Curated annotation (Swiss-Prot):
Record protein name field: Metallothionein-like protein 4C
UniProt function note: Metallothioneins have a high content of cysteine residues that bind various heavy metals. Acts as a reactive oxygen species (ROS) scavenger. Possesses superoxide anion and hydroxyl radical scavenging activities in vitro. Involved in ROS homeostasis during anther and pollen development.
Provenance organism: Oryza sativa subsp. japonica (Rice)
Tissue specificity as recorded in UniProt: Highly expressed in roots. Expressed in leaves, rachis, inflorescences and seeds.
Record-stated family: Belongs to the metallothionein superfamily. Type 15 family.
Additional remarks: Plants silencing MT4C show decreased pollen fertility and increased level of superoxide anion.
Record InterPro entries: Metalthion_15p
UniProt keywords, alphabetically: Metal-binding, Metal-thiolate cluster, Stress response
Length: 78
């Protein structure tokens, strides 16, 4: 199965040509503009934010998805 160097699987994506379950949604995502927000203030005490890091580690970003063979993202599949 040819992937054309692109693979999408949920929030894990490598390009945009393969595995598009919702092509119209992908179009809207690519045309969305982003804005930067600067927050000035005091950071919370260390004990209050420790759970946030652990929650982020359990997501797909922590698994280091990368394009693999047969139109798959490693470790998740299209």
């Amino acid at each position: 199965m040819s992937c054309g160097g692109s693979c999408n699987c949920g929030s894990c994506g490598c390009g945009g040509g393969c595995g598009k379950m919702y092509p119209d949604l992908a179009e809207k995502i690519t045309t969305t503009t982003t804005t930067a927000t600067t927050v000035l203030g005091v950071a919370p005490e260390k004990g209050h934010s420790e759970g946030v890091g652990k929650a982020a580690e359990s997501g797909e970003a922590a698994h280091g998805c990368s394009c693999g063979s047969s139109c798959r993202c490693n470790p998740c599949n299209c």
